[in-house]
């Protein structure tokens, strides 16, 4: 079955027909064909995509990406620990909110949604507060589309011997990185993002030695990261609780298609081409980006809403959907915006078609 429209969102996103077709078969969760030949292969492939170093392991977790963020924060910090969170968007704020719900000691550095983290403030905070044990940041903050300075963040954190937690939900698989070279302890991402699978589970790629120190720290039964890893390690990929089999099989197919595309580097280049073509085309139609180009990621871009009193996002959305494209509302608290993603099964020719569609559905007076 073909899609009626293209999802220009940061995930869930448009998937290939072959990824969707992979879900048409049922699987038994205790069968070796599923656990050894699919789950274990996925775990191995993900680690190899993340780093060339051998001291990392992978845990798959049922649920949304946020569930795995909560599993990580709730499983790796002991009662005497303290978390520092960088919050320059909704997803950084969500990590701080998770820490609050878990009654964790937490300090938040919040430079604002359109501002990059203040690295000098991060350095001084770590220097002046020795109680901080863990630091967390979102790599690609899809609230705005900003790409945060991952290398500098990791360098500063490790200079102070802190455990690093990176939400790479919307970057892993679409932006090249080696988490071993960056010395990241825990990196979290999701099936329905740049690997181009479907929703249903997320995953954590962790330094095995650091993860092994987390036994008994979890504040939740189902979100116990260590227990999930231990079960998979000792039982050839078996999940502790019901595995989302169809989603997992689709993800396996998505990984094969990433390899066929040429790997993360080639996919990143496609995303970059998509994003640059998108921004150029939108500016030609009179739209303005929220962020300067230097801060953009190749994942999703925020645009200011037109100033015309005739403009209404919902109407714009409905007209574009009828033309075959679905976009995203804004999430910035202090600016009226909307967002357009360019990841997933999206190619430069799709962006060309989008520009034609937007030009055709503009019903408001465009400012000169």
Curated annotation (Swiss-Prot):
GO BP, sorted A to Z = organic phosphonate catabolic process
In-chain residues carrying the UniProt-annotated modification N6-(pyridoxal phosphate)lysine: 193
Indicate whether Transferase appears among the record's keywords: yes
The terms under GO molecular function for this entry are:
2-aminoethylphosphonate-pyruvate transaminase activity
Print the keywords alphabetically.
Answer: Aminotransferase, Pyridoxal phosphate, Pyruvate, Transferase
Q: Which cofactor does it need?
A: pyridoxal 5'-phosphate
Q: Which reaction does it catalyse?
A: (2-aminoethyl)phosphonate + pyruvate = phosphonoacetaldehyde + L-alanine
Q: What Pfam families is this protein classified in?
A: Aminotran_5
- What EC designation does it have? 2.6.1.37
PANTHER family (alphabetical):
2-AMINOETHYLPHOSPHONATE--PYRUVATE TRANSAMINASE
The function of this protein is: Involved in phosphonate degradation.
The text of the family note is: Belongs to the class-V pyridoxal-phosphate-dependent aminotransferase family. PhnW subfamily.
Q: How does it assemble?
A: Homodimer.
State what protein this is by name. 2-aminoethylphosphonate--pyruvate transaminase
- Gene source species: Psychromonas ingrahamii (strain DSM 17664 / CCUG 51855 / 37)
Q: What is the lineage of its organism?
A: Bacteria, Pseudomonadati, Pseudomonadota, Gammaproteobacteria, Alteromonadales
């Amino acid at each position: 079955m073909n899609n009626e429209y293209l999802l220009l969102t940061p995930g869930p996103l448009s998937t290939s027909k072959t990824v969707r077709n992979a879900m048409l078969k049922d699987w038994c969760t205790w069968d070796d064909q599923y656990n050894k030949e699919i789950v274990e292969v996925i775990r191995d492939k993900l680690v190899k995509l993340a780093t060339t170093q051998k001291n990392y392991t992978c845990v798959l977790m049922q649920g949304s990406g946020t569930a795995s963020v909560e599993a990580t924060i709730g499983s790796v910090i002991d009662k005497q620990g303290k978390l520092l969170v960088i919050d320059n968007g909704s997803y950084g704020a969500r990590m701080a909110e998770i820490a609050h719900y878990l009654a964790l000691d937490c300090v938040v550095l919040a430079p604002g949604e359109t501002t990059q983290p203040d690295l000098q403030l991060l350095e001084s905070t770590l220097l002046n507060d020795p109680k901080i044990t863990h630091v967390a940041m979102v790599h690609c903050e899809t609230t705005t589309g900003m790409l945060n300075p991952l290398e500098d963040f990791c360098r500063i954190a490790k200079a102070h011997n802190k455990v690093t937690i990176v939400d790479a939900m919307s970057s892993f698989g679409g932006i090249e990185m080696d988490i071993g070279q960056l010395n990241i302890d825990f990196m979290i991402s999701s099936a329905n993002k740049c690997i181009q699978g479907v929703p249903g589970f997320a995953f954590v790629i962790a330094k095995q030695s650091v993860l092994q120190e987390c036994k008994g720290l979890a504040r939740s039964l189902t979100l116990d990261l260590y227990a999930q890893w231990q079960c998979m390690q000792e039982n050839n990929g078996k999940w502790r609780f019901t595995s989302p089999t169809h989603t997992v099989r689709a993800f396996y197919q998505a990984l094969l298609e990433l390899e066929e595309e040429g790997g993360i580097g080639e996919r990143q280049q496609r995303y970059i081409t998509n994003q640059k073509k998108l921004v150029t085309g939108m500016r030609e139609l009179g739209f303005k980006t929220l962020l300067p180009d230097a801060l953009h990621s190749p994942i999703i871009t925020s645009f200011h809403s037109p100033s015309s009193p005739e403009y209404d996002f919902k109407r714009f959305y409905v007209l574009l959907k009828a033309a075959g494209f679905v976009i995203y509302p804004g999430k910035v608290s202090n600016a009226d915006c909307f967002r357009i993603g360019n990841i997933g099964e999206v190619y430069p020719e799709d962006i060309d078609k989008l520009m034609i569609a937007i030009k055709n559905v503009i019903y408001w007076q465009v400012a000169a």
